[in-house]
Swiss-Prot record:
GO molecular function annotations of the record: calcium ion binding; calcium-dependent phospholipase A2 activity; phospholipid binding
Pro-peptide positions on chain: 10-17
Catalytic activity, as annotated: a 1,2-diacyl-sn-glycero-3-phosphocholine + H2O = a 1-acyl-sn-glycero-3-phosphocholine + a fatty acid + H(+)
Enzyme Commission number(s): 3.1.1.4
Protein name: Acidic phospholipase A2 Bc-PL
Tissue: Expressed by the venom gland.
Localization in the cell: Secreted
InterPro entries on file: PLipase_A2 (IPR001211), PLipase_A2_Asp_AS (IPR033112), PLipase_A2_dom (IPR016090), PLipase_A2_dom_sf (IPR036444), PLipase_A2_His_AS (IPR033113)
Amino acid sequence: AVCVSLLGAANIPPQPLTFLQFNEMIECTIPGSFPLLDNMDCGCYCGTGGRGTPVDMLDRCCKEHDDCYAQIKENLKCSSLLNVPYVKQYSFTCSEGDLTCSDAAGTCARIVCDCDRTAALCFAEAPYKRRNFKIDYKTRCQ
C-alpha cells in the first residue's frame, strides 16, 4: 500500500534522526516495506515539498504529516533548534503494528512522535495507486 522507487536509492542523502525513527514506525505498521524509499515521489505531498490538492489517501496522509510538523514549529515548546520536528528524538515502542509514544505528554518529543505515529498508521491504511507515482507535479499539483 505504498509507492516504492529503487532508482537512485544510492543517492539518498543522510537523514535526520527523526526521519529514521519515522521510518521505523512505518516498518512497524507496514511490515516488509522499505521506508527510506517508500512514499517518495508519490502524489503532491509525499517526498520533499508539497502543494495543491492531495491526489489520493496516501497523499492526504503526507499532507497531514506536513501540516502537523508545521504546527509543531509554531509550538513554543518546540521552538529551539534542538526541538524542531526534523531533529527531535523521541521514544516509542512497536508491537505487532501497534505504536506507542512513550515520552511524557505535552513534551516536544511526544508531540513529534504523535505526528509521526498518526502518519505511519495513516500510511498503513492508504491504498497504493501506481498512477500517482512520479506524477507530473506541475500539472497535477495545482
